[in-house]
C-alpha cells in the first residue's frame, strides 16, 4: 500500500486510511449517504472495514449497531470503536435483538457477510431503507452460496440496494486521504489492528482471519 506522506503511523495505510477505510467511506458516505438520525447495522463490526464504517456513521450523527461474536469483540465494538449497541450473533437471536434495539426499523445495512445475516436484517429494514452489498464472508469457506432475500422483500420495504466494488472509487482515494489523514493524525479516528510480528506469523494470521478469530484489521509486522 502507498503510505501518504503526512501519515506518521504507516500501518494506517493498511487499515482505516487504506483499502478498508476507502471501502467504508465509499459504502457509508458515497452510496448510503448516512445522515443524522439513521440507524446503521454493521456486521464483521470490528474488522478493518467495519471499524471505519462505524466511525464514519457516528461522525454523521447516526446510531450504530454492531454484529459480532465473543466477549472481546463485543468489548472492542462498544468500548473502543464507540458502537451504540452490540449484538452477539452466536449468543443472541438477531431478529429479536434488532427489534428491541431498533423498533422503528433499520435505516442502513452495510452487508459484509451475506446470508443468513443479510436476510434477517433485511426483514428489519424501515421503509425506504438502504442496503450496501459489499462482502460475502459467509461464502469464503463453504460450498453453500448466499442467495439473499426474496426480491419481494426489497419491493415491500421500498429499499435501495447497491453493490459496492471499492476499485470503482480508486480515483477518489486522494480526496479521501486529504480529508481523513489530518483527522487520523489528530487522534480522532481509532485504528483497531490485530498485529502479528514476523513474516513467519503470516499463515496463522491469515487462518485466523478466515476463521473469524481476528480482533481487528490483520497486520503482519515484518520490520520497523
Tell me the role of every PLM-derived stretch.
Residues 1-7, 18-19:
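Glycine-rich phosphate/adenylate-binding loop and adjacent beta-alpha elements
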Residues 8-11, 33-39, 103-106:
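Short helix-loop-beta connector
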Residues 14-92:
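Mid-domain Rossmann-like dinucleotide-binding core that forms the NAD(H)/NADP(H) cofactor-binding site
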Residues 85-90, 194-201:
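Short acidic-hydrophobic, aromatic-tinged amphipathic segments that line or gate anion-handling sites
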Residues 93-104:
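Short amphipathic alpha-helix with an adjacent loop that forms part of the alpha/beta core around
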Residues 107-112:
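Periplasmic-binding protein-like
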Residues 116-189, 195, 222-224:
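Glycine-rich phosphate-binding loop and adjacent beta-alpha segment
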Residues 188-195, 203-224:
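C-terminal capping/lid region of NAD(P)-dependent oxidoreductase domains
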Amino acid at each position: 500500500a502507498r503510505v501518504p506522506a503526512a501519515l506518521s503511523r504507516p500501518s494506517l495505510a493498511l487499515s482505516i486510511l487504506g483499502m478498508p477505510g476507502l471501502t467504508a467511506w465509499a459504502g457509508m458516505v458515497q452510496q448510503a449517504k448516512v445522515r443524522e438520525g439513521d440507524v446503521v447495522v454493521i456486521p464483521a463490526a470490528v474488522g478493518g472495514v467495519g471499524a471505519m464504517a462505524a466511525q464514519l456513521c457516528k461522525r454523521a450523527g447516526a446510531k450504530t449497531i454492531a454484529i459480532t461474536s465473543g466477549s472481546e469483540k463485543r468489548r472492542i465494538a462498544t468500548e473502543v470503536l464507540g458502537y451504540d449497541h452490540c449484538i452477539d450473533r452466536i449468543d443472541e437471536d438477531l431478529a429479536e435483538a434488532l427489534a428491541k434495539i431498533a423498533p422503528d426499523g433499520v435505516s442502513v445495512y452495510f452487508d459484509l457477510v451475506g446470508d443468513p445475516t443479510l436476510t434477517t436484517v433485511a426483514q428489519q429494514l424501515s421503509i425506504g431503507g438502504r442496503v450496501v452489498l459489499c462482502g460475502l464472508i459467509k461464502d469464503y469457506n463453504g460450498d453453500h452460496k448466499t442467495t439473499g432475500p426474496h426480491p419481494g422483500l426489497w419491493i415491500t420495504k421500498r429499499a435501495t440496494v447497491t453493490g459496492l466494488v471499492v476499485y470503482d472509487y480508486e480515483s477518489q482515494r486522494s480526496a479521501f486521504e486529504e480529508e481523513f489523514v489530518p483527522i487520523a493524525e489528530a487522534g480522532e479516528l481509532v485504528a483497531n489492528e490485530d498485529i502479528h510480528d514476523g513474516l513467519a506469523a503470516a499463515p496463522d494470521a491469515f487462518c485466523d482471519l478466515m476463521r473469524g478469530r481476528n480482533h481487528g484489521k490483520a497486520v503482519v509486522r515484518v520490520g520497523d
